[in-house]
Amino acid sequence: MKTPAWSRLAGYAWGVLLWNVLVALFGAYVRATGSGAGCGAHWPTCNGEVIPRAPQVETLIEFTHRATSGLAFLSVLALFLWALRAFPKGHPARFGAGLALFFMVTESLVGASLVLFGWTADNVSRERAVVQMVHLANTYFLLAALALTAWWASGGGPLRLRGQGAVGLALFLGLLALLFLGMSGAVTALGDLLFPVGSTLEALERSLTPGEHFLVRLRVLHPLIAVSVGLYVVFAGYLVAHLRPSPLTRRLAQGLAYLYGAQLLAGLINVALKAPVWMQILHLLLAYAVWLLFVFLATSALERGAKRVELGEGGEAVHRGTGGATWRDYLALTKPRVISLLLFTALFGALIAAKGWPGLGVFLAVALGGYMMAGAANAINMVVDRDIDARMKRTAKRPTVTQRVSSRDALLFAFALAVLGFAVLWWGANLLAATLALMGLIWYVLVYTLYLKRRTWHNIVIGGAAGAFPPLVGWAAVTGELSLFAWYLFALIFFWTPVHFWALALMIQDDYRAVGVPMLPVVLGERATVIQIALYALLTALISLMPLLLGELGLLYLAASLLLNALLLLKSLALYRRPERRTAVSLYKYSMLYLALLFAAMAVDRAV
């Protein structure tokens, strides 16, 4: 039962958290203004004095930071002592306060080491960069401990860490990713201070110049890391909100998405304005806010008694799994037949970009990493859709339906694949390729599976964009950038997808109708569907000719595309005239051959 004393302590705990955020921001101001050496190499004294006399501006700034940090230390110590007295033994708030005191001690020691070893002002050593990252990580841990203490003091329940399956893994990876992002941001901010640039273009050129200082070369990675982490954090947030569906987790996940969007916007403005001090502080404040919001999301989702959707309505035993799953069952989770065409467009995207052979390492990275990322998306899709899959003949034998693989194990498998796939693409190709693959996964799971599929017949048009990412991955793996031609490949698949999938939807419309999925034939009927297919087939044919106008492809591709498009339009016309299963099957099968041969023709044309 919550007592008035506990309420007062909770209010104090929230105040201590806020104070420490402000102190940390002021510490960033000290670094950004180059005032870290304002007290010389002395600590805890300032230039050998307890209170500096006739100080310079830099000395005043550094001394003020030390004074406010001292107050922060005392406030955390008081919080710890108060928690010991107010809460009974075993209460999580006592643990949180003790953890906060520990990280406050280490925070002070790391800050002292920066001063005592001279890693301030204009120092450009690797040691300073490493300690700067450690300092940032420790600050994150300190704020998290204070946030947990305030949460528990306010009546939040204890956490259940065991048996959380993929939710626990997703949250752990999210915290790890945000920590990594913050550390990369600390190094980038240090580079902005020590190696200022006149423009964004100059920053990019210098970061790609061999022999430049490591702080300069690392600068270009932070934006890509920010996008990658942002995609994952938003994905993890909404997935956790789906699997732990309380009003609070939903609000936190939604707030996290908006807040991270604001953080990315602030980062872009920071780059455009060449990192002024005030913008650096705002950017860091948003980073702290994102971190704390994710901590609260994790705490809410992992509380004892939280509803666990992945276990099903019938209780834990319903989707526990029957045991005896083989490697074939896990392979089936990835939908290898579906992936084959996605992988083909990714690999041929690499061949098209390279105008020939891209190299064995890149080719294998795209093949293996691409398969893992797509397989992860498909496995998550099987878990989310297992209720309707059980009622459709085409999907009734999937491992998540037959329960040969439990929902928990399927999600763990999916997250493992996603992490490994991202790592393979980053290591074997580059971060841009890995980020694009992650974007495709998130689009398929969040936009298509979780949001659009059961809401609107536009699900295929919008959600189908997920299938257009593979050629971007292949292209980026080779070139490290996305040209206009790469986006043309994206557009081609985007407009081709409705032709392909609506033909399938016509074939199995009774299944979709039975489970209430609003595919186009179910909502508007066969006539409207075949008209839409014909229109998208015409758009696909027109888009396929665009590279010829841009001078990117030659006569070989022209001949192949004319033949392939003629057949596509003829089969679409045949379906329009006779909207029956036989013509739908014919178009469905040909659409796959069409896309594969069109990409092959591009690759051959650019190679010869």
Swiss-Prot record:
One of its GO terms (cellular component) is plasma membrane. It is a multi-pass membrane protein. It is found in: Cell inner membrane. Its EC number is 2.5.1.141. CDD domains: PT_UbiA_Cox10. Pathway: Porphyrin-containing compound metabolism; heme O biosynthesis; heme O from protoheme: step 1/1. One of its GO terms (biological process) is heme A biosynthetic process. InterPro entries: COX15/CtaA_fam, Protohaem_IX_farnesylTrfase, UbiA_prenyltransferase, UbiA_sf. Signal peptide: none annotated. It catalyses: heme b + (2E,6E)-farnesyl diphosphate + H2O = Fe(II)-heme o + diphosphate. HAMAP family: CyoE_CtaB. Converts heme B (protoheme IX) to heme O by substitution of the vinyl group on carbon 2 of heme B porphyrin ring with a hydroxyethyl farnesyl side group. Carbon 2 of the heme B porphyrin ring is defined according to the Fischer nomenclature. Protoheme IX farnesyltransferase subfamily. This is Protoheme IX farnesyltransferase. The lineage of its organism: Bacteria, Thermotogati, Deinococcota, Deinococci, Thermales.
